[in-house]
Amino acid sequence: MQKLVFFIFSIVLVFSFKNDKPAYIIYNSKGKKVSFFKMKKELKNKELIFFGEIHNNPIAHWLQLELTQELGKSKDLILGAEMFESDNQKGLNLYLNDSIDSKGLDTVVRLWSNYKTDYKPLVDYAKRNKLPFIATNIPRRFASMVYKKGGFEVLDSLSADEKLWVAPLPFPFDSEIPGYKAMLNMFPGHGGPEIVKAQASKDATMAHFILQNIESNHIFLHYNGSY
């Protein structure tokens, strides 16, 4: 299995554009401030980068595009995002291959409400540079099934074609993962375990499609919510 290296920097956003106050500050895993270009220098030798964004934050989305463009100057990229569901891959490919326009994309792909401002620049960058853009997330209706039924077993009822859009079943689940434990604390009582399992179905599917599409001598840059 290929060695996978992750995004190990934290970006603190500062909502001011005055000369003496930067719009963002980047820290490495040791808590040391680093410049954007220092971060880029370290990241360009990695195979897999997770960019954990703050949804709907303009600075975070601007940094996503800046980092993508900078890495693309010296490395071959594969892009992917949780904001696109796996059953929409064919429609996304049609747009990337110039078979449909933006209006056509809006009819065949379930786009987030902030797509035009926050994700279209990334998709269009991939389109201009003929890069793959992988729709990694599980279809939302399947995650909803897991939540409502309270278990992964409900995914066994999917058709053979539908199962191609999720991680191979059964997939491992560890409720002791810190992120899942924190989620349980956020949703105590009824519904908490179901929410965690629904999230786990998303995580497993995203991991599956990342591993399915990662290539040697490339960087797979994945956009997802901060974790």
Residues covered by each model-derived region:
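Membrane-embedded segments
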Residues: 55-62, 69-80, 86-96
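N- or domain-start disorder-to-order transition segments that initiate the globular core
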Residues: 17-46
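Short, flexible loop segments at the rims of nucleotide/cofactor-binding pockets, characterized by
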Residues: 25-31, 55-58, 110-113, 196-201
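Short hydrophobic beta-strand that contains or immediately precedes a catalytic carboxylate
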Residues: 49-52, 221-224
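Extracytoplasmic/secreted envelope proteins and their assembly/folding machinery
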Residues: 36, 40, 61-68, 119-123, ...
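A substrate-binding/cap region within the structured catalytic cores of diverse enzymes
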Residues: 78, 90-215
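Solvent-exposed loop/turn segments at secondary-structure junctions
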Residues: 54-58, 84-88, 139-143, 226-227
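Bacterial Sec-dependent signal peptides at the C-terminal "C-region" and cleavage site
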Residues: 3, 7, 11-23
